[in-house]
From Swiss-Prot:
Its main location: mitochondrion. It is found in: Mitochondrion. It comes from Meyerozyma guilliermondii (strain ATCC 6260 / CBS 566 / DSM 6381 / JCM 1539 / NBRC 10279 / NRRL Y-324). Keywords: Mitochondrion, Transit peptide. It holds the Pfam family AIM24. One of its GO terms (cellular component) is mitochondrial inner membrane. Belongs to the AIM24 family. This is Altered inheritance of mitochondria protein 24, mitochondrial. One of its GO terms (biological process) is inner mitochondrial membrane organization.
Length: 387
C-alpha cells in the first residue's frame, strides 16, 4: 500500500544501517556503512513540522518513526526496538509512560491488548517499531505495517481492534462501537434483501470495532500483506470477513448500510454425483452388512460435524463471507486462514441408496391349457412338477 507524505520545512539527515541477519548470512561486513550490502538505510530527520511514519523492509515489518518536540506518540506496548537521534542526554529529553485506551470497554469489545506507551520528547527523535508486540503468553505472530493519513474527509472502521499499532494526532478521534448484527431496513429495501438479514461481521467474542475520524496518522498491522481495494458507487465485492481489516464509513452506523452476509445459491444437492442407485440388502451378506454399518457411521459423523459447524457459526456470527457495497475503500490482509467461497458438500453415496431387499430374477416355463373354450396360461420351473 503506497502512502505519500509531504513534510514542510528544512531537514538535515544522516544515515544508520540496519542489517537483517536473514539477508546477510555469511557475508563479510566492512568497517564502513558504504561497504555493507543487503542493508536498509534509515534517515534521521532533525527538523519536521509534524511526526512522520514510514514502513520499511520487505515485507514492511518495521516502522520508522520520526517524532517532533512536544507531540505525543502512542506506540503498542512492547514493540519499541530502538530510540535514536536524540540530541543531548536521552533520559533528560524523552519520557514514556503507560497509556490505556478505555481498558474496560476495550476488553468487552474484544480488544484485549489496549496498552500503549505514550512517548514525548523536548527535541526531535526517531524510533524503530516492530510489528510484533508482547502478549500475555509469548509474542504475536509476524505481521506487516500499513500507514494511513487521515485528513478528516472520511472515517475508517477498523474491524480488528488489535490492528492499531501506533498513532498520533491532536485532533484524531478514536472510539469503540458495537458491530451491528442486522442491516437497516432502508438498505434492505434498496438492495432487495429480505428482513432480517445479518451483516455477517458480528462475533460474540469480538463484538466491537474501532471508528477513526478527524486528522492524524495511524499505523496498522495485519497478517501477511495489506492491500487497498477501491469500490465505485454501486460496485460490490465478496470478501472473507477474516481478511477484512477495515473499510471507510460515513459515521458509526454506516456498516449496517453497506455490508451484508453472503449466501451462495449453490446447494449441496447440486454437488452430488449422479449415479445409479444401489439397492442392497444389508443382511444378505457380510459385505452388505459392513456397508450398512459404514453408512450408519458416516451419517453419525456428518451429523456431528454439521452440529459443530452450526454451533461455531452461531458463536462467530454467520458465514465466512460478506458483501461490501461501494463507494468505499477496503483494507484486506492476506495472512489469515482461507475459506472456500463455494459451499462444500461431499457426495453422499449412502443416502442415494435404497435399503430394500434385493430383487432376483429366474427363468420360468409357460404352458397353455385350453378347456371348454377357455385359455389358461401358467408358468412352472419344471414340467415334471406339473404332473
Amino acid at each position: 500500500m503506497n502512502i505519500s507524505l509531504r513534510c514542510h520545512g528544512h531537514m538535515s539527515r544522516r544515515y544508520i544501517s540496519i542489517i537483517p541477519t536473514s539477508a546477510v548470512g555469511s557475508l563479510a561486513i566492512g568497517s564502513k556503512a558504504s561497504e555493507t550490502e543487503f542493508t536498509t538505510k534509515l534517515d534521521q530527520v532533525n527538523e519536521l513540522n509534524s511526526p512522520q511514519f514510514k514502513a520499511v523492509g520487505q515485507p514492511p515489518s518495521v516502522l520508522a518513526v520520526h517524532g517532533t518536540p512536544s507531540v505525543p506518540l502512542y506506540i503498542k506496548k512492547g514493540s519499541i526496538m530502538s530510540i535514536y537521534g536524540v540530541q543531548g542526554a536521552l533520559l533528560d529529553n524523552i519520557s514514556s509512560r503507560l497509556s490505556l485506551f478505555a481498558p474496560i470497554r476495550s476488553f468487552f469489545m474484544g480488544n484485549h491488548n489496549s496498552a500503549y506507551q505514550r512517548v514525548v520528547s523536548t527535541s526531535p527523535f526517531s524510533l524503530l517499531i516492530s510489528s510484533t508486540s508482547k502478549k500475555l503468553f509469548g509474542r504475536s505472530a509476524q505481521k506487516t505495517f500499513a500507514v494511513m493519513n487521515l485528513e478528516g474527509t472520511q472515517d475508517w472502521a477498523i474491524i480488528n481492534n488489535n490492528a492499531i499499532h501506533a498513532y498520533f494526532g491532536t485532533s484524531l478521534i478514536r472510539r469503540l462501537h458495537l458491530i451491528p448484527r442486522k442491516i437497516s431496513k432502508r438498505f434492505a429495501k434498496a438492495s432487495g434483501l429480505p428482513l432480517p438479514t445479518n451483516t455477517g461481521l458480528f462475533k460474540w467474542y469480538r463484538p466491537g470495532y474501532t471508528l477513526l475520524s478527524g486528522r492524524g496518522t495511524v499505523a496498522l498491522v495485519g497478517g501477511g500483506n495489506i492491500y487497498n481495494v477501491h469500490l465505485e458507487d454501486g460496485e460490490q465485492a465478496v470478501v472473507s470477513k477474516n481478511n477484512l481489516l477495515g473499510l471507510t464509513v460515513n459515521g458509526p452506523h454506516d456498516i449496517q448500510n453497506s455490508v451484508f452476509q453472503y449466501r451462495s445459491n449453490l446447494k449441496s444437492n447440486d454437488l452430488t454425483i449422479a449415479g445409479e442407485k444401489k439397492k442392497i440388502n444389508p443382511f444378505e451378506s457380510f459385505s452388505h452388512f459392513m456397508s450398512y454399518l459404514q453408512m450408519i457411521t458416516v451419517s453419525g459423523f456428518n451429523f456431528l460435524k454439521d452440529s459443530i459447524s452450526r454451533s461455531v457459526r452461531y458463536i462467530e456470527g454467520t458465514g465466512d463471507f460478506v458483501v461490501v457495497t461501494g463507494p468505499r475503500d477496503l483494507l484486506l490482509q492476506s495472512g489469515v486462514p482461507q475459506s472456500n467461497l463455494l459451499n462444500r458438500a461431499a457426495p453422499d453415496q449412502f443416502t442415494q441408496s435404497s435399503i430394500t431387499p434385493k430383487e432376483t430374477t429366474a427363468d420360468f416355463l409357460n404352458y397353455v391349457t385350453i378347456d371348454k373354450g377357455k385359455t389358461k396360461i401358467e408358468s412352472t420351473p419344471d414340467f415334471r412338477k406339473r404332473q
